[in-house]
A protein has these predicted regions:
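Active-site mouth loops of central-metabolism enzymes
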Residues: 1-16, 35-37, 54-62, 83, ...
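N-terminal amphipathic alpha-helix/helix-capping segment at the start of soluble metabolic enzymes
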Residues: 1-6, 99, 265, 275
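Conserved, mostly hydrophobic/aromatic
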Residues: 3, 59, 107, 154, ...
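Glycine-rich, proline-tolerant flexible connector loops at the mouths of alpha/beta enzymes
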Residues: 6-14, 25-51, 79-87, 152-161
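Alpha-helix-loop-beta-strand connector modules within alpha/beta enzyme cores
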Residues: 39-60, 93-105, 168-179, 263-268
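Hydrophobic or amphipathic alpha-helical targeting/insertion segments
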Residues: 65-106
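Catalytic alpha/beta core domains of metabolic enzymes, predominantly
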Residues: 110, 118-274, 299
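Intrinsically disordered, low-complexity proline-rich regions
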Residues: 280-289, 293-294
Length: 353
């Protein structure tokens, strides 16, 4: 199960694109998408690909020549709508070139870009939007299959949770093609995270989906973090650092929000460092199995109500008092630590296990 994101810097700036890609890759991103609006951007994609540690998908609209140029530049996959790159000859040219290079094509349709006849059917009530999205996607898949191209991934994204669920359930019944999941135009960080987590999480729990992208009006790094957390929460990705923390209440007499964030950030940085080292080791060998590291479970609790119970189940735990914490290691009390030292101490013990 792969996590994807898409660059949002100038596609003609190779250095900026590569920097953003590497930043996402360091967080655990598996696939990075770049828009290719013109032939010059296709050349830039080639520069970026030569320096990229992960596969790149070229996002194509309207001009089939951009797809051909992206393939020549080394794109690992294409994302396009065969219906908007011209006539059958253009589709045939792209399909032949992709097949010759062994490059898959993702057929991606969105609720906001339905064909006029399908949009009219939705407006008239003769089709639901999910039905129209599925019909659009399958019609585009057929254009490729008619040219003998079978290496296809499909996405059909709506901008709300109920339509996303209905669309992908219909798609899963209608095709055996791998499905790329996501809620399109999901919004800013908070609502977008919630909408994607609910929709993508439900579909994955039902066994639907092969790749995901969490679309946010935010930096792509945040898309990656949310996507990985969705997979981890469902047991579909090796777990990273697990920090349990309470929501605080009037009993809390320590700055728990700050300390929990510091602990989480420090453990996440170490996790990314280990992941980077593991990937470098794998690249130097023929073994492509990702090394799974088990990170300790850490609890950061604000008071004695749930603190001792959480401490018993955690590898390392803090239980807040009045300006200080009790520190537990594998359920045993090892002492008190001042609030100013608490985050550092729990991270130190966690990394030593």
């Amino acid at each position: 199960m792969s996590v994807q994101t898409m660059g949002n810097v100038d596609p003609h700036d190779a250095a900026a694109c590569l920097a953003q890609l590497k930043s996402c890759a360091e967080l655990g991103c598996d696939v990075f998408r770049l828009t290719v609006p013109d032939l010059e951007a296709a050349k830039v994609l080639g520069e970026v690909r030569r320096g990229s540690p992960i596969p790149i998908v070229a996002d194509i609209h309207f001009d089939y020549r951009c797809a051909l140029a992206a393939l020549d530049a080394g794109a690992d996959a294409l994302r396009l709508n065969p219906g908007n790159i011209g006539g059958a000859e253009n589709v045939r040219a792209v399909a032949r070139a992709a097949k010759a290079k062994g490059v898959p094509i993702r057929v991606g349709v969105n609720g906001g870009s339905l064909e006029k006849d399908l949009a009219a059917a939705v407006a008239a009530g003769t089709l639901t939007r999910p039905q129209a999205l599925v019909r659009s996607a399958l019609d585009h898949v057929k254009l490729l299959e008619d040219e003998g191209f079978r290496d296809v991934v499909v996405s059909a994204k709506a901008s709300n949770v109920p339509e996303t669920l209905a669309t992908y359930r219909l798609l899963a019944e209608a095709t055996d093609c791998p499905l790329h999941l996501g809620v399109t135009e999901a919004g800013t960080l908070l609502p977008g995270t919630v909408r994607n987590s609910v929709a993508v999480g439900i579909l994955l729990a039902e066994g639907i989906g092969d790749t995901i992208r969490v679309s946010l009006t935010d930096r792509p790094e945040r898309e990656v973090k949310v996507g990985l957390e969705i997979l981890r929460s469902l047991g579909l990705r090796a777990p990273g650092p697990a920090v349990t923390s309470c929501p605080t209440c009037g009993r809390t007499k320590v700055d728990l929000m700050r300390i929990a964030a510091e602990v989480e950030d420090a453990l996440e940085r170490q996790y990314r460092l280990n992941l980077s080292n593991d990937n470098r080791t794998i690249e130097q060998s023929s073994n492509r199995t990702i090394l799974n590291r088990t990170f300790p479970r850490v609890a950061v609790m604000g008071c004695v109500v749930n603190g001792p119970g959480e401490a018993a189940g955690a590898d390392v735990a803090l239980c807040g008092g009045d300006g200080e914490f009790l520190l537990y290691v594998r359920g045993k009390l090892v002492g008190k630590v001042a609030e100013s030292e608490a985050a550092g101490k729990v991270v130190e013990h966690a990394l030593s296990l």
